[in-house]
């Protein structure tokens, strides 16, 4: 079973409180979502492998450390997931970006895929799927399945706020995927939103509501 980790770093929790507030405007909301994503990346990548490399400083030659292993591809679930991309890229600027486009059918609450584009070498990379909300788990499951169908085997999921139902849904369908969240909230409401949550992340990021 993949692990589920809540990242309780004080800065993450402080910033999460700001974006939960209903009076927080789109500009501030968008900026802080990126900041939280960057802080989460620091925690998620804590165990990345390192290798020795010989370099030359202004003082002479030395052996130091650099990242080893698979390179990273960030895979945001459109559209809200785009709000987390820059925060991750600030930590790992060499990462590539793929996208999975989905929308939620407001009647069935089920996700519908409408776009998929990833780097050609994605099967040789670790994929970090990002989306601010893990509600029913439908979108995350569909995105992970789309990657697996293309041959990706190393996948992690990073979300800001998760509902218990969404965590269970992903763990049931993709037990090999580790999930990271800034918060595990109380429950999923009948309308498919998370409580207490932070509202519609996409609308708040892009100022469309």
Swiss-Prot record:
Entry binding sites for 5-phospho-alpha-D-ribose 1-diphosphate: 79, 104, 131-139, 200
One GO molecular-function entry: uracil phosphoribosyltransferase activity
GO biological process, one term: uracil salvage
Pathway assigned in UniProt: Pyrimidine metabolism; UMP biosynthesis via salvage pathway; UMP from uracil: step 1/1
Record keywords: Allosteric enzyme, Glycosyltransferase, GTP-binding, Magnesium, Nucleotide-binding, Transferase
Biological classification of the source: Bacteria, Bacillati, Bacillota, Bacilli, Lactobacillales
Keyword flag Lipid biosynthesis: no
Class of enzymatic activity (EC top level): transferase
Gene (UniProt): upp
Reaction(s) catalysed (UniProt annotation): UMP + diphosphate = 5-phospho-alpha-D-ribose 1-diphosphate + uracil
PANTHER family linked: ADENINE PHOSPHORIBOSYLTRANSFERASE, URACIL PHOSPHORIBOSYLTRANSFERASE, CHLOROPLASTIC
Annotated function: Catalyzes the conversion of uracil and 5-phospho-alpha-D-ribose 1-diphosphate (PRPP) to UMP and diphosphate.
Similarity section: Belongs to the UPRTase family.
Residues the entry annotates as binding uracil: 194, 199-201
Cofactor: Mg(2+)
Cofactor comment: Binds 1 Mg(2+) ion per subunit. The magnesium is bound as Mg-PRPP.
Activity control summary: Allosterically activated by GTP.
Protein name: Uracil phosphoribosyltransferase
Entry's EC annotation: 2.4.2.9
